[in-house]
Amino acid sequence: MAPAAASLTAPNALAATSLPFLHGRKSGGGGVSVHAGAPSPSRAVAVVARRLWGSASSSRRMVVAAATAAEMAPAASGEEGKPFVEEMRAVAMRLHTKDQAKEGEKEPQAPPVARWEPSVDGYLRFLVDSKLVFETLETIVDRAAVPWYAEFRNTGLERSEQLKKDLEWFKEQGHTIPEPSAPGTTYASYLEELAEKDSQAFICHFYNVYFAHTAGGRMIGKKVSENILNKKELEFYKWEGNLSQLLQNVRNKLNEVASSWTREEKDHCLDETEKSFSYSGDLLRHIFT
C-alpha cells in the first residue's frame, strides 16, 4: 500500500509481519504508499475477543497492529456500499496507536527496535509455525467445504512451498528444524474450525494473514535478515509475477464474495479482526523471545 516511514517501535515492525494485517499496495516507484483507512461508522471496534488474554493479549495485539499504518492502502469514506476490503482495513487501523494512525486507539506497549534481539532459533520457530498456518489455509481453500472458498485457490500468494524451501536451506546450514509449537498448532486448529462453521470469520483471517505478509511481513523479514542472516533473502519474501496485481485480484474476489453478505455477516467478519491480530502476534513473538 515515495513510502512513508514506519514508526520504529517494536510493535510497528512486529505488526508488519504479523500474519494478519498490513495491507499494502505498491506505488509506481516501487515503494509502499501509506494512507489510513476511515473506519465504517457502524464499527465500534473494541471488538469481540472475549477470551481473557489479559495484558499479554494486549501486547500481542499491539505487536501485530503496528506496521499496518505504514502499509495500509487508502480506504474510502465511511459510507455504506464501499468495497468491503476497505472496511476490513479500516477496522484494523483502529487497533493501532495514535502515533501510528490517526484512527488508532491503543496505547504503545513494546520497546524500541534498538532493543530487539532476534535469534535464529526463534526465527525458525516462527517460520515453522507460519508454514503450518499457510498450509492450513491452502488446504482449506483446496478442499472448499464452502463452495466459494474455491475462488481463493492458486492466487499466487501461497507460501507453504516457499517456506519448505527456506527450512531446507536452514537444515543445510546445520540447523535443527523444530516441530510446530503451540502458537502454530492452536491457530491452525482454530482456522480449521472456523472454515467448517463460520465462513465469514474464516475469511477475515485469510485476508489478514496474506496481506500482512506481503507488506509489513517483508519489513520484518528484511530486518531479521540484516541482523542474523547476513542479509540473505528467503523465498518466503519472494513472489512470482506482479505482486500488486496478485493482491488486487484477491481484493476483487473478496469484494465479490462479500457483496452477497448481509450487513450482519459483514460485521461478524469485521469483529474477528482482533482475534486475527492476537493469533498472529503469538507467532511473531517467537522471533524476539
From Swiss-Prot:
Q: Name one GO biological process term.
A: heme oxidation
Q: Name one GO cellular component term.
A: chloroplast
Keyword Aminoacyl-tRNA synthetase present in the record's keywords: the answer is: no
- EC number(s): the record gives 1.14.14.18
Top-tier EC class? oxidoreductase
UniProt-listed Pfam families: Heme_oxygenase (PF01126)
Can you provide one Gene Ontology molecular function annotated for this UniProt record?
A: metal ion binding
Q: Where is the transit peptide?
A: 1-64
Which residues bind heme b per the record? 96
Its keywords, alphabetically, are: Chloroplast, Heme, Iron, Metal-binding, Oxidoreductase, Photosynthesis, Plastid, Transit peptide
Q: Where in the cell is it found?
A: Plastid, Chloroplast
- Reaction catalysed? heme b + 3 reduced [NADPH--hemoprotein reductase] + 3 O2 = biliverdin IXalpha + CO + Fe(2+) + 3 oxidized [NADPH--hemoprotein reductase] + 3 H2O + H(+)
Chief localization: plastid
What follows loss of this gene? Pale green and very early flowering phenotype and complete deficiency in photoperiodic response. Lack of photoreversible phytochromes and responses of coleoptile elongation by light pulses.
Q: Hey, which family's this protein in?
A: Belongs to the heme oxygenase family.
The entry's function note states: Catalyzes the opening of the heme ring to form the open-chain tetrapyrrole biliverdin IX with the release of iron and carbon monoxide (CO). Is a key enzyme in the synthesis of the chromophore of the phytochrome family of plant photoreceptors. Essential for photoperiod response and repression of flowering through cytochromes that inhibit flowering by affecting both HD1 and EHD1 flowering pathways.
What name has this protein been given in UniProt? Answer: Heme oxygenase 1, chloroplastic
Q: Which organism is it from?
A: Oryza sativa subsp. japonica (Rice)
Q: What's the gene?
A: HO1
